[in-house]
């Protein structure tokens, strides 16, 4: 059985994230969606809230072969813990490759974990958590950028 780890800050989870996660679920026996705590970021939602939001967002996906968790450690340590040989990351056209390639090389060095890149769905590639938060902060419509469940939660968090 091959387990893949799909990490991110997911603050908030976007439809782009959900697309990558569901595609990943079609490719692997089990997918661990891991909310990674990034000390460099100040999240709107706690780790537990993000885990719950992702679980709710994936509930209607038709996928059942996923686990949602969080870690404040290295993703490679999480991979070792669950015996996963691969990390899966989505790539947009905005320079994600350069940033993600560096991390992929570090992850391989640390734990011999490979990184697989899935290109973003062209319809969703302009969406990022940062853009969603910025649009929502300014009263813009984020419908279609995030799962419907996230819209009121984000609006409340930004009040």
From Swiss-Prot:
Gene Ontology annotations of biological process type: coenzyme A biosynthetic process
E.C. numbers: 2.7.7.3
Swiss-Prot/TrEMBL catalytic activity: (R)-4'-phosphopantetheine + ATP + H(+) = 3'-dephospho-CoA + diphosphate
Localization, UniProt: Cytoplasm
Top-level taxon in the UniProt lineage: Bacteria
Keywords noted in UniProt: ATP-binding, Coenzyme A biosynthesis, Cytoplasm, Magnesium, Nucleotide-binding, Nucleotidyltransferase, Transferase
Site residues (Transition state stabilizer), renumbered to this chain: 17
Annotated InterPro entries: Cyt_trans-like (IPR004821), PPAT (IPR001980), Rossmann-like_a/b/a_fold (IPR014729)
GO cellular component: cytoplasm
Keyword Cell membrane: no
Cofactor(s) required for function per UniProt: Mg(2+)
One GO MF term attached to the UniProt entry: ATP binding
Subunit description: Homohexamer.
Protein family according to the UniProt entry: Belongs to the bacterial CoaD family.
Name of protein: Phosphopantetheine adenylyltransferase
Upper lineage: Bacteria, Bacillati, Actinomycetota, Actinomycetes, Bifidobacteriales
